[in-house]
Amino acid sequence: MKVRASVKKMCDKCRVIRRHGRVMVICTNPKHKQRQG
């Protein structure tokens, strides 16, 4: 899980979602997991 100021899609499979007021990226590739913080 990467914590970043700006979360971006890294590939076509990445999805930008909101959970508990946090912007997150979920993907089939676990390296692409990010959350805003």
From Swiss-Prot:
It comes from the Bacteria. Keywords: Ribonucleoprotein, Ribosomal protein. The keyword Repressor does not apply. GO terms for biological process: translation. One of its GO terms (cellular component) is cytoplasm. GO terms for molecular function: structural constituent of ribosome. Pfam families: Ribosomal_L36. Belongs to the bacterial ribosomal protein bL36 family. This is Large ribosomal subunit protein bL36. It comes from Synechococcus sp. (strain CC9902). The gene is rpmJ.
